[in-house]
């Protein structure tokens, strides 16, 4: 059984990434399907949880993802060269220069008393309405902002010219994720938070370099959405009760603008804590030997992995969720600040953007190519574990067909709870909560199977679901597992 320490390993909380899987749910797969010294790959590694767990269990890992932001997260996760004491010392220098700049932006003087705002409620047009601050006893209080002071601030903000660099990268138009025509990354921020982020970025560049700078930047990108216009208030809990950025770029009628210095310092503490946790695990102790395995972070297209045939002992992956999460389009908020450019044309995704030719047919073709690559690099009779969540039958068909076409034989399946859920899972009672986890074995023989077309599949699934409901299985998870049992038991 996993200990509470293992379940809450801080190394996996340094940065957001969609669909992050809980280590305690996937770590046992490494012991079950691989040996010490084996080579393990995740072609769509994302945050890199599985690969990190495998590395710490002395497997040689290949951490692959086409998204540069994912590569950067993995680089920080796996780095052993960070000097934490140096990071803390450099932060003192950065904070010394940043503090007055940020305080000038977030200090309000009301009735002769100065307040340092932690969070500010603003209308969509930008007018500040309320703010939170700490009292002398460290209690958080909420105060209204007089209209005259709010108007004066808006005039100051509008006239201000930002002298430090910031990205003005265009966001791909996609109404499904509220990415509208001519929207840029800069539009996701108020002038105040954009100026503060730009100043912080410049000071990181001034005072730090190497692995220490990377750790600052991982905290920086992790904090961007927290201090953007994307933070919604949870009105049922109070005007300044914060929600979290999940997906997309929707800006509500009101949003919460957070103090960049205050929130960055919190994110930096999490990054340092996560790094210390990782370094401690790598070093080992009396109960666990030092890690002696290797890792490699690659930016290959999953449809064309730069690996020899039959060179991998175990594959685990969580492939793209169809149109549920357009990873590259949403990662622009991170990639732009990191000055990284994704290869959008090679992404495996279903996108509702009319600027991209990424529909279900392209998705099915690309998924099949990536699974063919998994088959090519995986040794005969070795194992491949797959997690997938999608409410679309067509996307599940694409995944299933790719497994069939490549002669992967199911040996096990179960339900896996996620560490983080997409909004549709959180907000819909009838949504699937978590992912199907299926493990396949590669058989060397070629396969020649006839598969049903889309209309036949739809009718078969509808009939099967109707029968399951008649039998008393009414929750979505139960129906999904019944489908798995019907189709995949060997």
Task: Label the predicted regions.
Residues 315-316:
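Hydrophobic beta-strand segment of the Class I
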Residues 36, 340-341, 373, 378-384:
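Short glycine-dipeptide loop
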Residues 364-380, 405:
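A short glycine-rich, Lys/Arg-flanked "PGG" loop and its adjoining helix->strand segment in the class I
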Residues 345-346, 382-388:
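Conserved beta-strand signature within the Rossmann-like core of class I S-adenosyl-L-methionine
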């Amino acid at each position: 059984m996993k200990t509470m320490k293992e379940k809450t390993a801080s190394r996996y909380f340094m940065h957001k990434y969609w669909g992050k899987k809980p280590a305690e749910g996937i770590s046992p797969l490494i012991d079950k399907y691989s040996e010490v010294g084996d080579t393990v790959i995740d072609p769509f590694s994302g945050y890199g949880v599985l690969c990190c767990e495998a590395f710490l269990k002395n497997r040689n890992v290949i951490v692959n993802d086409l998204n540069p932001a994912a590569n950067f997260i993995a680089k920080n996760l796996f780095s052993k060269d960070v000097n934490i004491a140096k990071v803390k010392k450099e932060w003192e220098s950065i904070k010394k220069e940043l503090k007055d700049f940020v305080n000038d932006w977030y200090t309000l003087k009301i009735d002769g008393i100065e307040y340092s705002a932690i969070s500010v409620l603003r209308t969509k047009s930008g007018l500040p309405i309320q703010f939170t601050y700490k009292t002398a006893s460290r209690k958080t209080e909420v105060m209204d902002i007089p209209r005259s002071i709010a108007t004066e601030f808006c005039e100051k903000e509008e006239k201000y010219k930002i002298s430090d660099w910031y990205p003005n990268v265009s966001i791909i138009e996609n109404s499904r994720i509220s990415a509208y025509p001519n929207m840029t990354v800069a539009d996701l921020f108020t002038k105040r938070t954009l100026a503060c982020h730009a100043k912080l970025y410049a000071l990181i560049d001034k005072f730090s370099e190497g692995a220490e700078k990377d750790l600052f930047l991982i905290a920086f990108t992790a904090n961007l959405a927290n201090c953007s216009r994307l933070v919604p208030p949870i009105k049922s809990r109070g005007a300044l009760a914060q929600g979290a950025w999940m997906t997309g770029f929707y800006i509500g009628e009101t949003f919460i603008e957070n103090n960049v210095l205050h929130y960055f310092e919190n994110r930096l503490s999490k990054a340092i804590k996560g790094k210390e946790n990782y370094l401690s695990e790598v070093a080992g102790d009396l109960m666990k030997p030092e890690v002696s395995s290797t890792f490699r972070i690659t930016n290959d297209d999953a449809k064309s992995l730069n690996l020899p045939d039959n060179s991998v002992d175990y594959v685990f992956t969580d492939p793209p969720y169809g149109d549920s999460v357009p990873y590259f389009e949403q990662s622009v908020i991170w990639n732009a600040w990191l000055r990284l450019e994704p290869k959008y044309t090679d992404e495996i995704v279903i996108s509702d953007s009319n600027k991209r030719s990424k529909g279900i047919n392209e998705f099915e073709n690309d998924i099949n190519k990536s699974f063919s690559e998994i088959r090519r690099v995986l040794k005969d009779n070795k194992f491949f574990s797959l997690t997938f969540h999608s409410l679309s039958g067509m996307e599940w068909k694409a995944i299933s067909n790719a497994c069939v076409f490549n002669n992967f034989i199911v040996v096990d399946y179960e339900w896996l709870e996620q560490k983080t859920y997409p909004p549709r899972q959180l907000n819909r009672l009838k949504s699937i909560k978590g992912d199907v986890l299926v493990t396949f074995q590669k058989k060397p023989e070629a396969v020649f199977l006839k598969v049903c077309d889309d209309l036949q599949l739809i009718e078969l699934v509808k009939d099967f679901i109707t029968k399951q409901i008649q039998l008393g299985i009414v929750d979505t998870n139960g129906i999904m597992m019944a489908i798995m049992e019907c189709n995949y038991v060997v």
